[in-house]
C-alpha cells in the first residue's frame, strides 16, 4: 500500500466516522437505535450505495468486529453492578444456555423449511442468529430506568450468551465440513464445558491478576486505561487460543475490575466510553460496507418470515421455557424480555465463520444473518420505549448528576464529585442548605450561581439554575436522587409507587381496619415484609408489584436488598 492509498484510507475512514457521529442525533428524532444509523452509513457508502466502495474482505471485517466486540464487552462488564447478580444471575444463565439452544432449534427448523435446506444447515442458520447482542442491548438499555430484575437479566444474558452461540456454530460447521465424520456426544459435551469453563476461569483469574497489577503500578494517569484495555485483550485472546470463550472472559474481566476499588477507575471508564463509541461506529461501518443490499432481494419474503418467526415465536418460547423455574418474573416481565431479544453484530460475525470455512451456501447464511439483524434493530429496537411502557417495567426516572468525576485521593479511592443542576420543579428550591437531609458520607463541596462560585452558609437558600457539586460515593446516588427529585410530570407517574406508603415492619392486622383487609388467623401475625416475600419471593426489586385483596402493592423502597417501604395504590375506575 503506497502513501496515496494510505491517505485515501484515512480520509474515507475519518469522513465516514464523522458523518456517523453527526447523524447520530437522528436516532432519537426518528425513534430508531443509533447502531442502525452507523450501519446505514456503511451500507450507503458501500457497493450498492452512492459511495460505491467495493469491500469484500471478510477477514478484515472479522478482525475489526472481534476487536470492537471485545472492547464493548470490557466496558459493559465494568459498568455492570455485581449486586444485580443477586436477582438476575441464574435467570440470565438459563436464557444464555437453554434459551439460545431453544431459539436455535426453532429458528433452524423454520430456516430449513423456508429455504429448502438440510436440517443441519437450518440449525446452523439458527445458531448464527441465536444469541442476543451485547453491543445492541447495552446501547439501547443505557440510561433507561428499568425494573432491576428485568434490566439486569437482559444485560447479563447478552454478555454471557455468545459462548453458547459460538459453540453451536463452530460445532455445526465442523459437522457440515466433515459429513463423513461422526461427532460423539461426549466430544460436544467436552467442547461445551471447555468453552464455558475456560472462559469463566480465565476471566475471573485474569481479572484478579489485572486488578492487582493496576493497583500496584504507579503510572501516568492516562496509562491505566491502556493497561486495562491491553490486559483485557490479552485475556480475551488467550482464552480463545486455549479453546475457551474469549467473549465471556473479557466480560468477566470488566465485571471484576468494575466492582473492585481500582486505581484510576474513573479515568479508565471515561477512556473506555470513548473507545466503545469508536468500536461501535467502526464495527457497524465495516459490516455495512460488507453488505450488498441487492443480494437481499431474492430472500426478501422468506427472510421476513424467518425474522418475524424468530421475534414472535422462537424467542418468546425460549424465554418462557427458560424462565419457568423463576416465579419472580411476572408475565409482563417475560413478555418484555422476549421482545428485547435484540440481534446486532454477533450474528453477522458468526455468519463470517462459514465464509472463512468455505462451506457451500455460506453467502446465504451471511445474507440471512444480516437481514435478521436489520429487522431486529428496526422492529424491536425502535419499539423498545413503547414495549417498556406497555409491559410496565419502566420505573419513574430519577435525576442523575449532569456529570460525575472521580477524586483520586488514594490509589483505590471510590470518592466522586456529582454535579447537579437545579431546575424550577425541584423540591429543594427555596430551602436553606442546613435543611437538606444530606445522606451520610456526602457533603456539598461547591455551589455555583450565574457562573459565580458562592461562599454559602447554612442559611443560603437554593434557587433555580444553581449548580451543586456534591462529594460522595456511588452508594449514595439513590439517596441523592431522592433529595434532588422533582414533582412528577403527570398523575400516572406520580401514582406509580402508590397513593400511600407504609414501612414493612407494620403488621397486617394494624392495616386491616384502615384498608378493609380480610385476614385469616395465619395472616394476623404477618408483617408487610412477610406479605412481600410470600408474593414476590426472597429477592424483590424496586417497582415490583402484586395485587392482593383488591389493593395494588408496589415495592417503593430498598436498602441493601431488603424492602423498607411499600406503596399501596387504591383501586380506581380505570385500574386494570
Curated annotation (Swiss-Prot):
Membrane-crossing segments per the record: 6-26, 34-54, 58-78, 87-107, 109-129, 163-183, 185-205, 219-239, 242-262, 271-291, 299-319, 335-355, 359-379
Chief place of localization: membrane
Domain RCK C-terminal: 405-486
GO CC aspect terms: plasma membrane
Record bears the keyword Nucleotide-binding: no
Encoding gene (name): nhaP2
Source taxonomy: Bacteria, Pseudomonadati, Pseudomonadota, Gammaproteobacteria, Alteromonadales
Example of a GO biological process term: cell volume homeostasis
Protein name: K(+)/H(+) antiporter NhaP2
Taxonomy, superkingdom: Bacteria
Record's bilayer topology term: Multi-pass membrane protein
Originating species: Shewanella baltica (strain OS223)
GO MF term (any one): potassium:proton antiporter activity
